[in-house]
Regions:
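N-terminal donor/sugar-recognition subdomains of glycan-related enzymes
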Residues: 1-258, 267-270
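Acidic, glycine-rich loop-and-beta core segments that form the ion-binding/anion-interacting portion
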Residues: 263-264
């Protein structure tokens, strides 16, 4: 464990994701996982279950070589977009970044906040955290994926993506990651269908837009809602990490306020 790694990682995390920083900064790190030195030198990770049985997460011999060999089977050089399922000590992501460009998108999903807190103490993650294409999601509710993935929906749907799994971690949280992957696949499949539909009917869409243009221009828009609910507070709710953080507060206050939701946030709020 080195304080310099932790300090550097927290500084990087605070710059790129203040919400995740606030979630992690007070955690001390998981006691279910053990970090030791591999025979080749870099740290390795193992898991101790409730019966005291040890399970290796990364190779005890050479975790870097293990990650490299696995990624070769995925032909990552053919991919621009990556979904990393299970972070661990980050060896797979470090190898992806070696050949990544500024256009590469790497979305990382880790279930265990305490494991992530432990990893920040053991490995310098600054190169991962500060890569412009990296987004890191820790203990994210799969129901909120719409908002989290929306900014890259078209990119991932058109250019596809490579799923990279830290299998030993996925196996430890199988129910969570199975649901997560199912929701991700469903989300991007729907996006592909929508893009195909738009392509087929694009002329009709533009025809309808121009046909309705006068009505758009004459519509009072949101001004028509002015003073509709005097003395009743209203909240406009978007999707994303902030919704994940505040949804319980919104649910407990629903009878005291008027909630306006974007489409991607509606389902989780119902």
């Amino acid at each position: 464990m080195t304080d310099s790694f932790l300090s550097r990682n927290l500084d990087s995390l605070k710059k790129v994701d203040i919400a995740l920083f606030n979630k992690i900064v007070s955690l001390k790190g998981s006691t279910e996982y053990v970090v030791t030195r591999s025979k080749s030198g870099p740290p390795t990770l193992s898991y101790m279950d409730s019966r005291g049985k040890k399970k290796q997460i990364h190779s005890n011999y050479d975790p870097v070589l293990e990650a490299t060999r696995y990624l070769k089977t995925l032909n990552i050089e053919e991919s621009l977009n990556f979904l990393v399922i299970g972070l661990g000590l980050g060896y797979q992501v470090f190898e992806i970044i070696k050949s990544a460009t500024s256009q590469t998108k790497i979305y990382i999903f880790e279930k265990d906040p305490e494991l992530f807190a432990l990893a920040l103490r053991e490995v310098d993650f600054s190169i991962i955290l500060e890569h412009p294409g990296v987004r890191l999601f820790v203990d994210t509710d799969p129901r909120f994926l719409d908002g989290l993935l929306e900014s890259e929906q078209t990119n991932f749907a058109l250019n596809n993506y490579c799923v990279v799994k830290q299998k030993s971690l996925v196996d430890e949280n199988l129910n969570y990651f199975d649901v997560l992957l199912e929701e991700i696949e469903k989300y991007f499949n729907e996006a592909k269908i929508n893009l195909k539909t738009q392509s087929i009917h694009s002329k009709l869409y533009y025809k309808n837009i121009f046909s309705n243009l006068n009505d758009f221009l004459q519509s009072p828009g949101i001004k028509s809602l002015r003073n509709c609910l005097p003395d009743i507070p209203a909240i406009v709710c978007s999707a994303g990490p902030s919704l994940d953080t505040n949804i319980q507060l919104l649910n407990t206050s629903r009878k005291r306020l008027f909630l306006i939701s974007v489409g991607t946030a509606l389902k989780p709020l119902l």
